[in-house]
Amino acid sequence: YYIGNEKEGVLIDAGRSAKQIEDALKTNGLDIMAVKAIFVTHEHIDHIKGVRVLASRHNIKVYATKGTLSALEDKGELNGKYDYEVISPDGNEVADMEIKSFPTSHDCCESCGYVINTADKRSLAIATDLGYISDKVRNAVSGCDTVVIESNHDVNMLQNGPYPYLLKRRVLSNSGHLSNDTCSAELANFVENGTTRIV
């Protein structure tokens, strides 16, 4: 996700190749030099595939939790060719936005979501790859104008589908992924607390 304007912004994750991300930005009228930082939610490949090349090629700083940075180091993604930093518990100011993390439940080292507060007093929460919606997630996204949240399965279809048993168990666990029903049950709470857009 690119969050910002035509002059500057940040990426939340970079799960495609660097070239795909550069091309997508260009298609949308954005220059890669507008990207001032990459905030990583967790170390799974579908969230970090382009991080190392983008950050190295364009001197983009990477922010993540301590656990995620440690996992990236173990994967050889911290190659010394770009700057990285543990996200501050008080938030980080980048591209005229305040970006704060909140913990999420997923099967990785230390996953998180982000709340982005803009200079014009708008707020956006991004919560992907959640096993369940904890009170910490609920409190973090409460009142945000826009909430981007992922749910990716119907429980019955998953249970009766072709996936191996262990994968089904992983997806359904509290460190897996939200079901569509669980997510939809929360949407009314978001709206009651001021959210006007859900993606």
Language-model-detected regions and their locations in the chain:
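Divalent metal-coordination and catalytic microenvironments
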Residues: I3, H42, V62, I99, ...
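Active-site neighborhood of phospho(di)ester-bond hydrolases with catalytic His/Asp-centered motifs
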Residues: L11-G15, V35-E43, Y63-K66, A125-T128, ...
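A short helix->loop->beta-strand "cap" motif at the edges of active sites that frequently abuts
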Residues: E8, H58-K61, E192-I198
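Active-site metal-binding motif and surrounding structural segment of the metallo-beta-lactamase
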Residues: K19-A64
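Active-site glycine- and acidic-residue-rich loops that bind
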Residues: I126-R138
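Conserved beta-strand hairpin/beta-sheet module of binuclear metal-dependent hydrolase folds
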Residues: Y1-N28, C112-D129, T146
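Cap/insert and terminal regions of metallo-dependent hydrolase folds
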Residues: D135-V199
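Metallo-beta-lactamase
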Residues: K66-K121
